[in-house]
Regions:
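Conserved phosphate-binding/catalytic region of the ribokinase-like
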Residues: 1-6, 197-314
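Glycine-rich phosphate/adenosyl-contacting loop at the front of the ribokinase-like
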Residues: 1-71
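Conserved N-terminal subdomain of the carbohydrate kinase-like
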Residues: 46-129, 154, 311-314
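Conserved beta-alpha-beta core of the PfkB/ribokinase-like small-molecule kinase fold
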Residues: 124, 129-206, 223-225
Length: 314
């Protein structure tokens, strides 16, 4: 990585309302990019978060958790309006969770904190979820990808949420524009099913690998993950676990994938095209992190020690 070695994550931060009983919800800090930043911090990666955060009680909690996880929140904008909300319907390892978002008139709605010259302060930029294609936030994310230059790398996770993104015909070109610019891309088989109905997800993922990224990774829930690069395909199964909650599992996978890449010198200045051995190692690490997250309630990404213990390397 470049001299500062920072991974900058940009996107939404919100509060997940997760059902605990029929009429009881628990407020849990979340948002896909936010979870990814927290996960990176817990894995020991120097991380910054560029998001729009409220000054209300929940916004203060979001900032506090970033700090506790070793993430620099100084790239973010603080807004006096309330924190955005997401009502979560729990899923299984096969189906994943479902979300209903409440974003209007909240801190989410406003100018992007992501500046075009971000590469002067960070080695790698990760963008993701609906904020990467939504209005002014999405436009800023696209400009940021375009401005990466030769000394920085980028990654993108579309994390499609059908009930918050525009119709497919409008969303697909925006997603593909970002795929073409990103160094690395991660998406789920559900993302591909929604974006390309009737096309096998593996075929769509292989097609993305030909659009420009060095690597495309597709997660398949309880079936593991696949990687596409240099015309090759690597398949890595997931371990058998007792699933408690799938919320945040994909974000834990993303953060662990980036952490493993950083360790192998695949982020920032001097980043190289990955080898088959490296990609296999990255998938194992990311799948282990996601599996740990599925064994506990809420988006709770693991620490490096927890992942190492599962892999037998700690």
């Amino acid at each position: 990585m470049s001299s500062n070695g920072l991974v900058l994550v940009s996107g939404e931060a919100l509060v997940d309302l997760i059902p605990r009983e029929e009429t009881t919800y628990e407020a849990v800090l979340g948002g896909s990019p936010y979870n990814t930043a927290i996960g990176l911090g817990r894995l020991g990666v120097a991380t910054g978060f560029a998001g729009r955060l409220s000054s209300d009680t929940m916004g203060e909690a979001l900032v506090k958790e970033l700090s506790a996880s070793g993430v620099d929140a100084g790239f973010s904008i603080i807004d006096p309006r309330p924190s955005p909300l997401a009502f979560v319907t729990r899923g299984t390892a096969a189906t994943g969770s479902r979300y209903s978002f409440y974003l209007g008139a909240t801190a989410y709605d406003g100018p992007s904190p992501l500046v075009a010259d971000w590469a002067a302060r960070a080695a790698h930029l990760h963008i993701g979820s609906f904020s990467a294609t939504d209005g002014a936030l999405g436009a800023a994310a696209l400009v940021a990808l375009q401005g990466a230059g030769s000394d920085a790398t980028t990654s993108y996770d579309p994390n499609i949420r059908p009930f918050v993104v525009p119709p497919r015909a409008e969303t697909l070109p925006m997603v593909e524009a970002r795929v073409k610019l990103a160094t690395y891309v991660k998406a789920s088989d559900e993302d591909f099913d929604w974006l390309y109905p009737g096309t096998p997800p593996s075929e769509a993922a292989a097609r993305w690998a030909g659009l420009g990224p060095r690597l495309v990774v597709m997660t398949r829930g309880g079936a593991g993950a696949e990687a596409y690069f240099k015309g090759e395909r690597i398949v890595q199964p997931a371990p058998s676990i007792d699933v408690v909650d799938t919320v945040g599992a994909g974000d834990s996978f993303m953060s662990a994938l980036l952490a493993a890449m950083a360790e192998d010198g695949a982020l920032g200045s001097g980043a190289h095209d990955p080898s088959e051995a490296e990609v296999g190692r990255w998938l194992l690490f990311a799948i282990a992190a996601a599996a740990i997250t599925c064994t506990r309630q809420g988006a709770q990404p693991p620490t490096r020690a927890e992942v190492d213990k599962v892999l037998g390397s700690g």
